[in-house]
Amino acid sequence: LTTLYATPFGDAYFMACTHTRKLLEKLNAARLGMDEAAPYINTGVLLYNLPALRADLDMERVRAFADEKQDVFLLPDQDILTALYGDRVHLLDSMVYNLSDRILALHNAELRNAPVDLDWVRAHTVIIHYCGRLKPWKPHYVGVLDVFYHELMEEIQK
């Protein structure tokens, strides 16, 4: 995490990853009433530029947007962040800082991408995000990244 924490924000308010593709960015922009599509931000891993936010954040704007658009929100935190501040997010590599089984499967399904296996994940990924309903600590988990959860649990129980 040292490299992540040392990453400069520049003029960004946040550092985060996106888990959507261009088509969904356009659909989300239309749904949220945005002038331009911005990467749809996954808030599972989110770093805040506190000095910039303390200086610039307009909570009335956030509240007004939430009141106006509440009926179209799917994931309210992500919808608000994307719509109001999507242009002020420093995007991080999801394969490194917010890897989920879905992102791994989508990456490996694209022919132009070099396949990524668990050895690659072990060597390069910093944060695994068990997002959605399926969790490795619950029955019926589907995916391959549960191996890291189980290894951690074994280590803790020693």
Where are these regions (language model features)?
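A short, conserved beta-to-alpha structural element at the edge of catalytic cores
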Residues: 10-34, 139-145
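A short secondary-structure junction signal
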Residues: 1-4, 25-30, 56-61, 140
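GT-A fold catalytic core of metal-dependent nucleotide-sugar glycosyltransferases
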Residues: 1-24, 45-48, 55, 81
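A glycosyltransferase accessory/donor-loop signature
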Residues: 38, 42-158
